[in-house]
Every structure is written in C-alpha cells, then in structure tokens.
C-alpha cells in the first residue's frame, strides 16, 4: 500500500511531523520531488531536527529511506545531513538513491543567486538552493543523471558541452567567473564515489516491495499553492507538489496510492513572495509568529521570518481538492490558545464580488479577505489525547474548518512532539 503526505497550502504545514509519526507503521519512506530548498522539522526522542533531503521517517531503524527520481539531489547536503543525525546518536539509516535522480550542481546554486541579483526588486524570493536552474537544466536535457556518473566517456563529453553552454551566460549575462570543465569533472567524480553504494533502480525496488505487501510512504515538499501548474504562478517552486506527482517522482503506478493525507495548519504562514490573502501584519503577526510552530515561525531552510495569516478556507479547500485528499491532518492547533477571538478567512472579495473559489494569480492579487470571527478557548491543549476532551470552542473551530473545506479532518496535532496527536472520527470520512 502507498500513502502520501502532502501540503495544502504554501508549505510549512507540519508535514515532517506527520510523516515521522506515520513512518512508525511504514516500511519505506520516499522523497519524490523538490530538493534542499525546504526543510521538514521533526521533534522526537533524539531531539529537534530540520531535514532538507532525507525523508522524515529516517529515525526508525526498520525503515528504508528513498531518494526518488523526481528529487533535485544535492549530494553533499545529503551526506552532511546523514552525518548530522548520526552525530546525535541516531542509528545509521538505510538509504537508497534512484539511478534516475538528477544531480543539483554547485553552479545551479550560483545561477540561482545571480538571477535573483539580476532581477533586483522583481526577484521571486528564491531560497537560492539552485532549484529553478536545476529543473531548467533537467527539462533542457543538460542535467546530470546519477546513472551517468558511472559512464566515464559520456561524462567527459557532457561536462565539456555543459560548461560551454553555461559559460556563455556567465560571461555575457551575469559577468561572473566561468566554469572550469576539469574542475567540474572532478566534482562529479567525488559525487560518484560518495553515492555509489546507495544507487539502485528505485522503481523496481518499490515494485517488488509492494508485491511483498510492504507499506510505502511518499513525503511531499511544500504545498499545493507552490505547484507550478496549480499554484500562485509565477511565485511557485519548479517541481509538482501534488500527490499525483508521487507516482512519477517515485516510479510507482498511480493506482497504488490509496491514502492521501493533506496537512493543513490551524492558521496560515508562508515564506517568499506571492499573493497571501489572509496575511496579517504588525504586532498581531509578530505575536503569532513568536508563538507559532515549535519555536517560532521561521523558515527551516532560510531562517527568514515567515509571513503570517489567519486560516484561509478558500485556499485550503482548493489545496485539498487538488491533492485528492482522503484525510486532513490539522496541525499546530495548540498555538491558537492565547487568542480571545480567532478570525478565519471564509471568502475572497474580488472587484466587489465574493467568491469561495480559488482564482488565478491575476485575480488573487486583487482579493480581499472575507473574515468570520470564532471564539477562542483561552487555554493550553497540549497533552490532551481524546478529541472530546478538547475545549468546546476548540472543537467548534475544528468542525467549522472541516465544514468550510469539505474534507475530513481525522488528525489534530496539539504539540510539536511525535505523539502530540489526536485522532477523530469525521462524518465526511467515506
């Protein structure tokens, strides 16, 4: 059986914690898209970790962690990450890397920074992790696939060709130092030696595992609103963030994905530029940011303060629909316990008309939030294990959100730890 854990919104929803929790019952956890541009924060018995490439189930000795073909593989970061967890007494994880994954090169990171510098005030707010240049090269067919590291003749020829192409841009557009082909080849040789013991045919590995009845967990990065097709284009990432892409980025049949757990935050947050209708500012935002997450709302990759907002029912309903949601995991509910009243965005006013349907970006830029205010519960809900033991206003908040988005909230997270979770029955669960 294959399950997917994905985000409904802009990322930062708490997918790492949910994956870490569900991984206890899984055999294999797969990263299927994205790169080291977004971090998943996990709090468990070993401590607090921010993972960028490793799957969040890496802390269980019984699991195999897979880097799928859809990932932008930064090989040094992968191995730095492995060392960072084993240095803190986490057992050495079982790692498998797809021979069809492509390699994020140092020059991708350089080009990312150069382009943001060139764009100036019109920049996209990139994490400067090299993601857009990487995927640009992948689809221009000038990327380096892991399998190519083991074909020396092909590698030498390709290094010269790629360096020539890149150097035209470096010299004439960015006016930056050129790439030395010999140094580039040496870098690729180092990468080959690092990754060689872990490389395999991942799609075949997963196919055999599913025949044996094993459970596979697909871990998504970011969320629906960062998808290049269905998100707030162009302020999006460069690989699909949808569960449907899990079949492609991991190499499994689409019909194998039986459960799609979409993670929603009890309020909204975002990193980077782009339309954010329910955004709040000033002291109100600062207080929510300070209390939020598991130690403040700051990007796990960039450390940038996240933009804050109230829960957005319009965006979340859309995000859940596009993901094909079977279950919603509703996270960081405990954070809202300080508020007397909690506004919720239930619609968008665009050119004088109210809609509950998520629009394209040009219309989204004009949208103003239509807010409904719900009563707060004014207490700490951490430690509660049963849904019925939550304060009445807290339950009403969850049930109101569920009604608005139209998808079953079956998990409620009320703390940062692996076991801070409440399971609930939903009338929407078929």
Predicted feature residues:
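Non-transmembrane, aqueous-exposed alpha-helical and coiled segments at domain scale
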Residues: 1-430
């Amino acid at each position: 059986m294959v399950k997917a854990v994905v985000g409904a919104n802009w990322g930062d929803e708490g997918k790492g914690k949910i994956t870490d929790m569900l991984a206890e019952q899984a055999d294999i956890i797969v990263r299927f898209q994205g790169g080291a541009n977004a971090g998943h924060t996990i709090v468990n018995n070993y401590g607090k970790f921010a993972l960028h490439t490793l799957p969040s189930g890496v802390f269980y000795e019984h699991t195999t962690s897979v880097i799928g073909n859809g990932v932008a593989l930064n090989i040094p970061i992968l191995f730095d990450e492995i060392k960072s967890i084993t240095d803190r007494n986490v057992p050495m994880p079982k790692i498998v890397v797809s021979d069809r994954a492509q390699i994020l090169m140092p020059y991708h990171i350089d080009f990312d920074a150069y382009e943001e510098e060139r764009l100036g005030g019109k920049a996209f707010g990139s994490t400067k992790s090299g993601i857009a240049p990487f995927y640009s090269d992948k689809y221009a067919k000038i990327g380096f696939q892991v399998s190519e590291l083991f074909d020396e003749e092909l590698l030498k020829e390709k290094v010269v060709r790629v360096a020539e192409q890149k150097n035209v841009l470096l010299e004439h557009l960015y006016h930056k130092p050129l790439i030395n082909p010999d140094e580039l080849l040496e870098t690729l040789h180092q990468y080959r030696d690092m990754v060689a013991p872990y490389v395999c045919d991942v799609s075949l590995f997963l196919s055999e595992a599913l025949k044996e009845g094993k459970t596979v967990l697909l871990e998504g990065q970011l969320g629906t609103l960062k998808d290049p097709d269905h998100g707030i284009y162009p302020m999006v990432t460069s690989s699909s963030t949808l569960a449907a892409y899990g079949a492609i980025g991991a190499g499994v049949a689409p019909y194998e994905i039986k459960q799609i757990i979409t993670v929603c935050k009890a309020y909204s947050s975002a990193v980077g530029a782009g339309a954010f209708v329910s955004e709040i500012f000033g002291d109100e935002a600062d207080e929510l940011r300070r209390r939020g997450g598991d130690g403040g709302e700051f990007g796990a990759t960039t450390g940038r303060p996240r933009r804050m907002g109230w829960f957005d029912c319009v965006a979340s309903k859309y995000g859940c629909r596009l993901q094909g949601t079977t279950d919603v995991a509703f996270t960081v509910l405990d954070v809202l316990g300080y508020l007397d009243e909690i506004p919720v965005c239930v619609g968008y006013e665009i050119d004088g008309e109210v809609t509950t349907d998520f629009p394209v970006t040009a219309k989204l830029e004009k949208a103003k939030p239509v807010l409904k205010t719900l009563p707060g519960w004014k207490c700490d809900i951490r430690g509660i294990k049963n849904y019925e033991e939550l304060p009445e206003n807290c339950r009403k908040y969850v049930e109101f959100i569920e009604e608005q988005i139209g998808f079953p909230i079956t998990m409620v997270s009320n703390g940062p730890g692996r076991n801070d979770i409440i399971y609930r029955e939903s009338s929407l669960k078929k």
